[in-house]
Amino acid sequence: MTNEDTFSTIDHAINLETGKTIRVWETFPKDNSLVKNNTILIASGFARRMDHFAGLAEYLSSNGFHVIRYDSLHHVGLSSGNINEFSMTIGKKSLLTVIEWLKRRNINKFGLIAASLSARIAYDVANEIDLSFLVTAVGVVNLRDTLERALKYDYLQLPIEELPEDLDFEGHNLGSEIFVTDCFKHQWDTFNSTKNKMKDLNIPFIAFTANDDSWVKQNEVLELIESLNPEKCQLYSLIGSSHDLGENLVVLRNFYQSVTKAAIALDKGSLNLDINIIEPKFEDITSVTVKERRLKHNIESLELA
């Protein structure tokens, strides 16, 4: 655990009965901020580690939020396991484990922010857990279609025995048999399965699409939103952004600003993003990012020792 006085990110380890560990990072609200009602739990997108969301955590904590991030099991990052054994169900179990850990610490009021592939997991559990609100960014609603667009081929049409050993997804080897088998077994693959999981949603929900997103069909996200309670959900677009929310500093800042505004609005029961926020200094974000990378390397070094 790091010194809270000199570094705002606190490292925790959830040790499981299986011998595996889920790593969690915690950031408290800034001292001069108006503390909000809810904690924010961030679920990173596929092939993204929790330290990739240092900037978002800095924005949220500067605006009064207590922020929790984690790395999924069998994923990139600090938690146990290799990404070639990742499945959507493992991602779901990792999220639920972190939520149970929060509840054991008497943190019962929280909103969930999920990006990309993790948003599909969020859609799966939103009706199963006691969330205050949900925010998704470039959230996957049709997993099979997104995989085909990302991989340039519909591998889910192949019999299991004809699949390649690994699927190269964003430079990482995803174990095809494990991932595809899980998709079909637990019905992660279709747009209708997402709609069915979300159909009774009764919490405030804001979704962000990106107008240049080639991996997610905006019309399907709109269809999902239109199937829900119109008084509790709203769709916004991140203009000028692709599926990669970190492709440049302009896009990244827009993402940070928009999601922070959504969290503040939802925390006070609104869907309106016409909100003033406190923007952390660029050098503060850079400093936290560097310190978190150093923390990550120190943890990895200790695990290898």
Swiss-Prot record:
Its EC number is 2.3.1.-. It holds the Pfam family Acyl_transf_2. The keyword ATP-binding does not apply. Pathway: Lipid metabolism; fatty acid reduction for biolumincescence. Keywords: Acyltransferase, Luminescence, Transferase. InterPro entries: AB_hydrolase_fold, LuxD. The keyword Acyltransferase applies. GO terms for biological process: bioluminescence; fatty acid metabolic process. HAMAP family: LuxD. Belongs to the LuxD family. This is Acyl transferase.
